[in-house]
Amino acid sequence: MKALVLGLIYAASTTSVLATDPSVPYPKGYRDWHHVKSMVIKEGHPLFASFGGIHHLYANDKAIKGYRGKSFPDGSVIIFDLLEDVQDGSAVTEGARKVVGVMHKDSKKFKTTGGWGFEGFGGGDPSKRVVGSNAAS
């Protein structure tokens, strides 16, 4: 699953042609969901070129059950919110949103990827889909 997530974020951060297939819905209100963790990837990290910045991971109620148990039920949604990191004196603050990556569990709809559909929204804009019709690959 980690490789699939990294692939989603890579596609979202490097794709310039935006698709329009709404297979995975935009997660309205995701910042009010469960906050799972945050991290900052800084220059010098091997993934900095593609994934540098502040990462926040959010999960809906069903996904939290998956984190606590052994499997994620259908309807689980996990969000990878990637923002630029801005140095502000001795602090790091959030800059512009780079992408909102979404993993949506639906075993019937996304059979070829273990039940997960993937989408990235460029700059967090619901109209800027970067995965589109490839949501299940």
Whereabouts are the PLM-identified features?
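Cleavable N-terminal signal peptides
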Residues: L6-G7, V17
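N-terminal post-signal-peptidase region of extra-cytosolic proteins
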Residues: G53-R68, D88-G89
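Sequence context surrounding c-type heme c attachment/ligation sites in exported
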Residues: T20-F48, G69-S137
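Catalytic cores of secreted/periplasmic or lumenal enzymes
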Residues: K2, L18-D21
